[in-house]
Swiss-Prot record:
Bilayer topology term: Single-pass membrane protein
Disulfide bonds: none
Classification of source organism: Bacteria, Bacillati, Bacillota, Bacilli, Bacillales
Keyword 4Fe-4S (UniProt): no
Source superkingdom: Bacteria
Protein name: Uncharacterized membrane protein YobI
Organism in which the protein naturally occurs: Bacillus subtilis (strain 168)
């Protein structure tokens, strides 16, 4: 009972509310899309149409104009005004499929159907077109009553007795036998009904049979009559022409209006309609004129202005009425503005937007529909705070590009694709920024590891590695035709040339042939890239480290801005064609809407219904970003975070998209969301760039910074490692983080962060540590547990407690700065100074860490360590060999006595020229290495400074310290060593021994000559023979170096004809010595001589009138020289020999000269200068009696018997 009462009360309340509501009909904003009937305000079009219809000659009228120009509205207006004067038949072919086959027949069929089915079947009862008829129940009942009445009347009229049994006691039966006039009239009426009803039934049956029965074939006996079926291939109009004529005969239509025929671009249908019009108007059975009116576009007969187009238009139509468009691109904006002005949205729509966008709209129906749909969408989605301009833009897009709009609902189409492409473009821009970030990070990494201080130092190292820095190097590198080697002056331009090289050829120790820039810059992969190191050094010189770090921060911010960038901004910044596809770029309206942001990333809200409850648009966008995994800027504003929380689930708080400054502050302020807070902290502790960027931004916005830093520190062990090593933050920002961590993080968490001692290292170098944290006890605990080693102690002097704690616990590095403070600002922190100090703790600390002391103190500055303590350090077994090598290479010193240094260091000491250049050290090293010259010792000797110093003393001066044999061995090694350069040998030759005999088989000609020139080879037969054996002329030079000695011992040397010739031809041998030499020649020396040498020897003898031995004379007279040469020699020697010898020599010469030796003879010989000299000498010697000179002969008279 109570439930019924409750419902009754509710019903009454609703009734009262309805009664209170004013019964005012709200004026609708909507407007139908059908043609208007009140557009012809001035009546011009109606008058023109009326004139055409009244003109008997006009049967086809064209109303022409573009789509949307108002043709249908004009016709509607005309029909409204002249509905009594004319009967209008409207035929519209508003189909959108214009590509079907057999188009003309389909059009004719559609026209015929619209005619036939336009009128009631009663109007054209004889039409063969079937149609479904609805028979009402009332009609069925009436027909049945008439049928049964007909039966009863028939029985009554023709067999009344049959009814007596049924109606014996009825009122009817009592009236049958009466003669009452009324009864008679009733009978007559019934008889008439009996006659009329069958006639009416027959008429109906006839109509049915005629309309539905089709006789195609009749067979009688063996004969078949078949109807002609050729009409099946004829057109629809031809096939049903009788139906059309019957239609107009039976109906009253005299004006037929055709619309939308021009959609099909089919000229044939106009031809068929014109023919049909002629048939209708010429038909005798149709007693009226029928006019066809066509609403068509101007270019229906062609899209090019030709004479044929003009003729076709005027041929087809009897009267053409042009229509001036009601709307076009220039006035559509005014029309739409007018509509909006009279709506509740007049103040919400931007006028400039309307003016711009309506340029693309030139159809009134489209314009009306845009407004209608805008009103519906705006009312339906009014619960969400949407931009009306964007709403209108979306509706315009929906109407102008309906197919793409439909695709957008299913994440397809051009609009969807461009927003997808936007993400790809953003990712490409992010990639470019990441590349810049990587480049800067690589630069910073190179700067951190770079140890060199200048480009000159870098050039020297790389050129040395390439082996083209040494002046004596034979290696070179050819860059674009320019050769670079050790002895050229263009080495300073090497790397500048290399940077832009096209072709590179190298000729090096281990590489010959072409090379690449990278190969040369990295010394064939053995060293870091030269140009990267060059950039690093330049950056260090310009102090650009902080600049690079600031650039990194700016790039990270730019990444965040780009990720939040709208498509509108993207289009503005980029070339439109790079954003829009070619297909989309053709759709200018859509491009406009996208370019100006009227269709943006929030388009989903404008095309789908969303139940927002109390969520704002930004809240919805944020929720969607999480659901769709599309990140928004971390600072994105949120309005109702409580409602947002209700829309999210636990797993979503682990997504990167959930990161938002306002959201996290809200969660931190509400303890009930602790689980969500932990999920976000775990997400932030993964070390990703997104997480770190968020932490950096939120740190200063957090409502509880201490709790946030403590949470991050507890979850992220690499927190400080990332900040210090990988973040590339500026120094100031790093200090801010360090202060926050030391202040808010737990000690256990800080210790856990100290991976690879990063935190310890950081604290050790901070000079303002005490200003970062005020809690001294916490500092002490951290310093001890982290084993911090301070790089400097100056800043700790302000706190005596901390300073003493650090010194007592050895929490400082051994370096110049710390030891200088501890040792009271000592000027030079040498090992000797440490040993001589009174601070045993420092001495012990240094000795326990001697390697560190040497590296961080001795090797960092040019401190002169006394030789005694320096040798002590080098000889220490606990000092690392690597450190010793570094000492030798970096420190300036010279070992006076190499023997006092441990042997293993000799090679590097000698190689680095850290040994005093004296023969004692050289010989000691030579003896130590088994009387061999190791390469480092040879390099020491080749050093210009060293060889000059050694040349000041002769090696023989050390015979009291070393055996004579050792001195000879090292001298011989110096002479024979090919590794000792000729330049060095020229200098050292003054210090080595001289040799009575030295084997020269391994000595170069140049060095042999130097030995001769420096008188280190004595003139001995052994040295003479050794030189002659190994060289062409040096034995002669040795002889000429000592001419007097050579002439004195001429017989001790093995000479040949060539030697004799060289000596005779030499300008260095005096004429006197030459004469003595020739006079004492042994004939054996000339046995291997050729005729030229023998002839030259004879010539020299004759020229200088020398007396030679009979032995030599005999040899020369028997030599194969010319007779003239031998006769001239004999002629010159006759005065030096006796007659007996003359006789012997003349006999050796042969006839006719041998006959001169016979007495009592008269001999004839040729008269020439040689013969004349001979007989003259013989006559002077009184060897012949006389001679007489004829013209051609000389007559010689010998002595009488």
């Amino acid at each position: 009972m109570g439930e019924i009462k409750k419902k009754f009360v509710q019903w009454l309340e609703k009734l009262l509310i309805r009664l209170k509501e004013p019964n005012v009909k709200e004026e609708s904003l909507f407007e139908d899309l059908s043609p208007s009937n009140d557009v012809d305000t001035d009546g011009k079009y109606s008058k023109a149409l009326s004139w055409g219809l009244e003109n008997k000659k006009v049967k086809n009228i064209a109303l022409t104009g573009p789509y949307g120009s108002g043709k249908s509205s004009i016709l509607n207006t005309f029909q409204k005004q002249y509905s009594r004067e004319y009967s209008f038949l409207n035929i519209s072919l508003a189909t959108f499929n214009t590509d079907t086959d057999d188009m003309e027949n389909k059009l004719e069929k559609s026209i015929l159907q619209q005619m036939i089915y336009r009128v009631h079947d009663r109007t054209i009862p004889f039409s063969r077109f079937k149609r479904i008829k609805h028979i009402r129940t009332k009609s069925i009942i009436i027909n049945l009553i008439f049928f049964f009445a007909f039966i009863i009347v028939g029985i009554y009229l023709f067999k009344p007795d049959a009814l007596k049994g049924i109606y014996a006691e009825t009122l009817v039966s009592r009236s049958l036998g009466t003669e009452d006039q009324q009864q008679i009239r009733l009978t007559i009426l019934l008889a008439l009904f009996f006659i009329v009803y069958p006639l009416l039934a027959y008429k109906r049956i006839y109509h049915f049979v005629r309309a539905n029965l089709k006789l195609n074939k009749v067979t009688i006996a063996n004969t078949t009559l078949e109807k002609n079926t050729g009409e099946e291939n004829s057109s629809i109009f031809d096939k049903y022409l009788d139906e059309i004529l019957y239609f107009f005969e039976a109906s009253k239509y005299n004006v037929v209006i055709f619309e939308d025929l021009d959609r099909f671009n089919n000229i044939g249908i106009f031809e068929r309609l014109r023919e049909l019009n002629e048939l209708i108007n010429n038909s005798e059975q149709i007693d009226r004129r029928v006019v066809f009116i066509y609403a068509i576009k101007d270019d229906i007969f062609g899209d090019a202005d030709t004479e044929k187009l003009t003729r076709d238009r005027t041929k087809f139509f009897d009267f053409i009425i042009p229509v001036i468009p009601i709307i076009n691109a220039s006035n559509s904006g005014d029309i739409l503005k007018k509509k909006i002005k009279h709506s509740p949205y007049s103040d919400l729509i931007n006028t400039h937007f309307l003016e711009d966008v309506t340029i693309y709209i030139d159809d009134m129906r489209v314009l009306k529909n845009i407004f209608n749909e805008f009103v519906i969408y705006q009312q339906k989605l009014s619960a969400i705070d949407l931009d009306p301009n964007k709403m209108l833009a979306m509706i315009i897009y929906k109407n102008i590009y309906p197919v793409d709009f439909s695709k957008l609902q299913y994440n397809k189409g051009l609009v969807y694709e461009i927003f997808q492409k936007k993400q790809l473009i953003i990712e490409e821009q992010i990639k470019l920024i990441n590349a810049k970030i990587q480049q800067l990070e690589r630069k910073l990494a190179n700067i951190e590891v770079e140890s060199l201080k200048s480009i000159a130092e870098l050039n020297f190292i790389y050129l040395s590695e390439l082996e083209i820095s040494n002046l004596n190097s034979n290696y070179d590198i050819n860059i674009d035709g320019e050769v670079f080697r050790g002895n050229t002056s263009n080495k300073d331009r090497f790397f500048e040339k290399l940077k832009n090289a096209d072709t590179i050829y190298c000729y090096l120790r281990n590489r010959n042939g072409p090379a690449t820039i990278k190969e040369i810059a990295t010394v064939f992969g053995r060293k870091p890239n030269y140009f990267e190191r060059e950039d690093a050094i330049k950056a260090i010189e310009k102090n650009e480290i902080q600049k690079f770090k600031k650039e990194l921060l700016e790039l990270e911010r730019e990444k965040q801005e780009i990720r939040a960038q709208s498509l509108q901004v993207l289009i503005t910044k980029m070339n439109s064609k790079d954003v829009f596809s070619d297909k989309l770029y053709e759709k200018k309206l859509l491009v406009y809407l996208l370019r100006h942001g009227y269709i943006d990333e929030m388009y989903n809200h404008y095309i789908t219904y969303f139940y927002p409850e109390s969520l704002s648009l930004s809240d919805i966008k944020f929720v969607f970003s999480i659901k769709n995994h599309e990140s928004l800027p971390y600072s994105f504003e949120l309005d109702n975070i409580g409602k947002i929380m209700s829309k999210l689930v636990g797993a979503e708080f682990k997504q990167i998209e959930v990161l938002n400054f306002h959201l996290l502050n809200y969660i931190m302020d509400h303890s009930e969301y602790r689980n969500y807070y932990d999920s976000i902290i775990e997400r932030l502790a993964n070390g990703s760039k997104e997480s770190v960027t968020f932490i950096d931004g939120f740190k200063e916005r957090a409502i509880n910074k201490a709790a946030f830093i403590q949470s991050i520190s507890s979850k992220w062990d690499d927190f400080w490692s990332f900040i210090e090593l990988r973040s590339n933050y500026t120094q100031q920002k790093k200090e801010e983080y360090l202060s926050d961590i030391l202040t808010y993080a737990d000690i256990a968490d800080i210790i856990r962060m100290n991976k690879e001692s990063v935190m310890s290292f950081t604290l050790s170098k901070y000079l303002n540590l005490l200003s970062l944290v005020s809690d001294e006890e916490k500092i002490k605990e951290l310093l001890l547990k982290l084993q911090v080693k301070f790089k400097s102690l100056d800043h700790l002097l302000n706190s005596e407690t901390i300073y003493d704690f650090v010194v007592q616990r050895n929490l400082y590095e051994i370096n110049i700065k710390t030891l200088s403070v501890i040792l009271n600002d000592a000027p030079n922190i040498t090992y000797a100074a440490v040993k001589n100090s009174d601070q045993q703790a420092v001495i012990n600390y240094v000795n326990d860490n001697i390697d560190i002391f040497v590296e961080k103190v001795l090797l960092t500055e040019e401190i002169e360590e006394p030789e005694e303590s320096f040798l002590e350090l080098l000889n220490r077994e606990d000092l690392d060999k690597r450190v010793k090598h570094a000492m030798i290479m970096k420190k300036t010193f010279a070992i006076s006595d190499i023997g006092e240094l441990i042997k293993e260091l000799w090679p590097i000491v000698i190689r680095e020229n850290k040994m005093v250049a004296c023969w004692s050290n050289v010989i000691t090293s030579y003896v130590e290495y088994n009387k061999k010259m190791p390469d480092f010792l040879i390099a020491f000797l080749n050093n210009p400074v060293n060889r000059k110093e050694l040349s000041k003393n002769n090696i023989e001066a050390f015979d009291d310290k070393f055996d004579e044999a050792i001195l000879e061995d090292i001298s011989e090694e110096i002479i024979n060593s090919r590794d000792i350069t000729d330049e060095t040998f020229e200098v050292l030759i003054a210090s080595i021994q001289s040799w009575i005999y030295f084997p020269l088989g391994n000595v170069s000609e140049k060095r042999a000559k130097l030995l001769i020139d420096n008188d280190l080879l004595s003139l001995t037969p052994e040295n003479f023979k050794e030189l002659k054996l190994n060289f062409d002329t040096l034995h002669i030079q040795l002889a000429l170096r000592n001419p007097d000695e050579f002439i004195d011992k001429q017989g001790d040397f093995s000479l040949d004809a060539n030697d004799i010739k060289q000596l005779i031809d030499s300008n260095e041998l005096s004429q006197f010595n030459k004469e003595i030499f020739v006079q004492h020649l042994n004939s054996n020396c000339l046995t291997d001589g050729n005729n030229d040498i023998l002839k030259d020897t004879i010539y020299f003898i004759n020229e200088h009138n020398l007396k030679i031995t009979n032995e030599l004379l005999t040899f020369l007279l028997e030599s194969p020289t010319t007779l003239d040469t031998r006769l001239s020699l004999l002629a010159g020697q006759i005065k030096h020999i006796d007659n007996e010898s003359i006789t012997e020599f003349l006999t050796k010469i042969g006839e006719p000269y041998s006959e001169i030796a016979e007495k009592g003879r008269r001999i004839k010989i040729s008269n020439n200068r040689t013969n004349k000299a001979l007989v003259t000498a013989l006559e002077s010697k009184n060897y012949i009696s006389s001679f007489k000179e004829d013209r051609e002969r000389l007559r010689v008279n010998t002595k009488k018997k």
